[in-house]
Amino acid sequence: MNWRSEHIWIELITGSRKISNFCWACILFLGSLGFLLVGTSSYFGRNLISLFPSQQIVFFPQGIVMCFYGIAGLFISSYLWCTISWSVGSGYDKFDRKEGIVCIFRWGFPGRNRRIFFRFRIRDIRSIRIEVKEGLFPRRVLYMEIGGRGDIPLTRTDENLTPREIEQKAAESAYFLRVPIEVF
């Protein structure tokens, strides 16, 4: 969602609360729970899940490996659920031409540096840079080049934009900020 007027442009960033993250967290949780239940049912010799008879799976080595995969999957699943609940990576980009200030805010992991906030002047922005890497896994990222601070990405690296979409976004940003576009 974006909000734009003549002098202010606010772009909201989704972060980790994407549908794909919800799907992966659910699939991983259910799959690892299944592995753990099958492994423990082979240990106890009882059917905790009616889909697989526990007599067909020997505890050593198959049951141990399934328990290990189940526990590892539950840890990874809990990590995904935590990043979703903490909304890691979400925030906003605010460009204010009237004040001459750019604010970039993102939520991070809990702790001392949970709030990631950059603030700088529009006149410090040198250019909007498009980085394109073609090949088997193409990558197109939009950066804001700032004097003395380096480059700040404006698009996520996992956001697969088409060449037309990345050009459109770069043109809108460069036009609003009145800076040139560079392509690498």
Swiss-Prot record:
GO term, biological process aspect, one: photosynthesis
Subcellular locations according to the entry: Plastid, Chloroplast thylakoid membrane
Keywords: Chloroplast, Membrane, Photosynthesis, Plastid, Thylakoid, Transmembrane, Transmembrane helix
Membrane topology classification: Multi-pass membrane protein
Principal location listed in the UniProt entry: plastid
Membrane-spanning residues: 19-39, 57-77
Source species, domain of life: Eukaryota
UniProt GO cellular component terms: chloroplast thylakoid membrane; photosystem I
Function (record text): Seems to be required for the assembly of the photosystem I complex.
Family classification: Belongs to the Ycf4 family.
Protein's name in the database: Photosystem I assembly protein Ycf4
Protein's organism: Nymphaea alba
Lineage: Eukaryota, Viridiplantae, Streptophyta, Embryophyta, Tracheophyta
Gene encoding the protein: ycf4
